[in-house]
A protein has these predicted regions:
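RecB-family 4Fe-4S metal-dependent nuclease core
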Residues: 1-144
Length: 144
């Protein structure tokens, strides 16, 4: 079972904005959708989570969906924007103000990930970083 809670949704001018509040950390800019699925330190997990919410909501209603991350500690800055951006380093970034642009690629990659997770031929490997185990729901299952 996969679950989660969308912190806030609001609609304005034909767009449903999915807002995920963050109390720590800093905004990250993935180079592309694939980076959301590539295990690495500093991976933009928050964006993955918000895109997952956007993918669900995009199928449940007709409005354009715009996922966003609101970093509370940065919100007072006049230059801050909660809009998620995607783009290569040292190149112009593209705001994700319409999830449908990325939806097919995200869903395709998500399906591939789920197939890998549920493939009984795929061996489970524990992470080497035991700090990740502190809040993991499955630590008892893998004996950590």
């Amino acid at each position: 079972r996969i679950g989660g809670t969308i912190d806030r949704m609001d609609s304005k001018e034909g767009t449903l904005r999915i807002v995920d509040y963050k109390t720590g950390g800093s905004p990250k800019v993935p180079a592309n959708i694939e980076q959301l699925f590539t295990p690495a330190e500093g991976r933009p997990n928050y964006i993955f989570q918000t895109f997952l919410y956007a993918a669900i909501m995009a199928r449940q209603q007709a409005l354009k969906v715009a996922p966003s991350l609101l970093y509370i500690h940065r919100a007072a800055s006049e230059s801050y924007s909660p809009v998620i951006e995607i783009g290569e380093a040292r190149k112009p970034k593209l705001p994700v103000d319409d999830f449908s642009v990325y939806e097919d690629e995200f869903r395709e990659r998500l399906l591939k990930l789920l197939e890998e997770i549920y493939d009984d031929k795929e061996e489970f490997t524990q992470t080497e970083d035991t700090k990740k185990c502190e809040y993991c729901d499955f630590k008892a299952m893998c004996k950590r």
